């Protein structure tokens, strides 16, 4: 941004990428929990922008492979930090499975990114909203009853089988 040519480079990029449709490109996303309506770039562009700095750590091929990983996380106290960090890094961006039956209590606030206004809410709902605000295109498979005899088969076998499960 401090580059003298930044403004001209940005104009060239926008014109090349969007032609004359900069204002009409992208999609609208509505977050009903906070009443916000935002205009953002398309799925592929958002993913590329969010993972752009990973290029110094892993190759584009590796990034694409990790994007397609399906990760399951059971328990969203410490697991909530794992989930959001995976999403920030662009891992498991196609599909993520989360299982948690518990509600957020004050004693959880030392390990869960949430505020006191979230106390009493289901941990899985708090995290799902945070993840959708990072990546509104992600497919989340939520198991608000946690894992039990009824949900286990679906968690490990339906849609896409998890490549990796954290508990």
What are the residue ranges of the model-derived segments?
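Adenine nucleotide-associated cytosolic modules
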Residues: 1-167
């Amino acid at each position: 941004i401090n580059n003298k040519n930044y403004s001209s480079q940005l104009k060239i990029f926008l014109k090349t990428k969007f032609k004359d449709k900069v204002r009409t490109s992208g999609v609208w996303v509505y977050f009903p929990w906070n009443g916000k309506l935002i205009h953002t770039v398309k799925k592929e562009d958002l993913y590329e922008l969010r993972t752009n700095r990973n290029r110094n750590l892993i190759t584009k091929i590796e990034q694409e492979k990790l994007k397609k990983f399906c990760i399951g996380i059971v328990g969203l106290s410490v697991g909530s930090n794992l989930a959001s960090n995976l999403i920030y890094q662009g891992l498991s961006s196609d599909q993520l499975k989360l299982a948690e039956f518990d509600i957020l209590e004050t004693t959880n606030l030392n390990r869960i990114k949430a505020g006191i206004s979230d106390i009493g809410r289901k941990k899985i709902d708090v995290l799902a909203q945070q993840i959708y605000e990072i990546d509104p295109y992600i497919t989340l498979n939520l198991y608000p009853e946690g894992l039990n005899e009824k949900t286990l088969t679906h968690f490990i076998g339906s849609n896409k089988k998890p490549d990796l499960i954290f508990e």
